[in-house]
């Protein structure tokens, strides 16, 4: 079976068409600047040259129509007809408490996703637009929703509740939801295979480190604690997000800078993190380069970030009562040997120790632990598209 995976942002759309017999992509691509001037589709067949298609793309329906046209194009397409596509898997950012797993999309499911809009006002509307476009353009093809939050629905109440009046949870559903769930789920399954152990009995700490970063404690294949919270702003300091703060700082900044609540929220999401601390960039590669050129603030930002990661690993080791493995994934986790070394240095008490030669790996699955390490350190490139496709296939096969 071939499965199309769709990930819609407000003005962008990423897609992959996967052959589930081999679990590999046949084509992938990106539509940029939806609803804006200069819209473009970059289409990459797995065994061909990339095609760049410019067009007026006023909305997600037109964007998906262009993607489908590209997939069947006689010149650079990869399937003879759309009938070869057995199902579509959609990334949906927020499923609230309603969804603890991926689901076949029905009218009731769509209504529930719409009810989660206030929890993810920037993300769920374009996710919905993508689903509606596919329903219109591919009638009769099963559509599946895969939620970023679903994997974390196994967290116990003592992990997901905040120190607020319980009525606020009942009235407004204020609680920790967690994100990057599809990524954490994928790498935890790969880790079990790499370690040649069943998920049951395994204690894993998964570090998804990139422009957005989160850490998850995984026990018996299930998430029991995670660093992102009610929104993706909580937890680690990130590319442009502040991460954990004393809540009183928010009103203090509002008063000092004369900001509205929307403005301060925008500030904490887009102008803080390593960008704010370094004054250089939100891209860790740029910051590492600036640090190497003697930039004090760049060095400071990297130190704060690695300290943050180490602190969360320590607290999750406490929650798990030890750890069998620490996983590094996503852009920074997969590619920065320096960051991995800075994080693992000082975790000897956990039994974690790097082999510095093996740690030079970039973007490939590897066990980078020293032979004597009792807590393994793994690099596992994430593959959210494959995880979405596997979940979609599972649901279609179950009928």
Swiss-Prot record:
Listed PANTHER family: ACETATE KINASE, ACETATE KINASE-RELATED
Pathway(s) of this molecule: Metabolic intermediate biosynthesis; acetyl-CoA biosynthesis; acetyl-CoA from acetate: step 1/2
TM ranges: none
One BP term from GO: acetyl-CoA biosynthetic process
Subunit structure: Homodimer.
Annotated gene: ackA
Entry-linked InterPro entries: Ac/propionate_kinase, Aliphatic_acid_kin_short-chain, Aliphatic_acid_kinase_CS, ATPase_NBD
Keyword Signal: no
Functional summary from the UniProt entry: Catalyzes the formation of acetyl phosphate from acetate and ATP. Can also catalyze the reverse reaction.
EC number per UniProt: 2.7.2.1
Official protein name in the record: Acetate kinase
Pfam families, per database record: Acetate_kinase
Active site: 148
Record keywords, A-Z: ATP-binding, Cytoplasm, Kinase, Magnesium, Metal-binding, Nucleotide-binding, Transferase
EC top class, as a word: transferase
Any one GO molecular-function label of the UniProt entry: magnesium ion binding
Sequence similarity: Belongs to the acetokinase family.
Annotated compartments: Cytoplasm
Origin species: Desulfitobacterium hafniense (strain Y51)
Predominant location category: cytoplasm
Cofactor(s) the record lists: Mg(2+); Mn(2+)
HAMAP family referenced in this protein's UniProt entry, alphabetically: Acetate_kinase
Cofactor note: Mg(2+). Can also accept Mn(2+).
PROSITE patterns xrefs: ACETATE_KINASE_1, ACETATE_KINASE_2
Residues the record lists as binding substrate: 91
Residue sites binding ATP per the record: 14, 208-212, 283-285, 331-335
Catalytic reactions on record: acetate + ATP = acetyl phosphate + ADP
